[in-house]
Swiss-Prot record:
Component of the cytochrome b6-f complex, which mediates electron transfer between photosystem II (PSII) and photosystem I (PSI), cyclic electron flow around PSI, and state transitions. PetG is required for either the stability or assembly of the cytochrome b6-f complex. The keyword Iron-sulfur does not apply. Pfam families: PetG. Belongs to the PetG family. It comes from Phaeodactylum tricornutum (strain CCAP 1055/1). The 4 large subunits of the cytochrome b6-f complex are cytochrome b6, subunit IV (17 kDa polypeptide, PetD), cytochrome f and the Rieske protein, while the 4 small subunits are PetG, PetL, PetM and PetN. The complex functions as a dimer. This is Cytochrome b6-f complex subunit 5. The chain crosses the membrane at residues 5-25. The keyword Lipoprotein does not apply.
């Protein structure tokens, strides 16, 4: 009964971390473009 909960938590952490990395990279990319312009 614990495995579904654990797998759900792991999937949630992976999704959130991936989303966070994507947002950070996007913000850094935009900031770099603003500096160039």
């Amino acid at each position: 009964m614990v495995e579904p909960l654990l797998s759900g938590i792991v999937l949630g952490l992976i999704t959130v971390s991936a989303l966070g990395l994507f947002v950070a990279a996007f913000l850094q990319y935009r900031r770099g473009n603003q500096f160039e312009i």
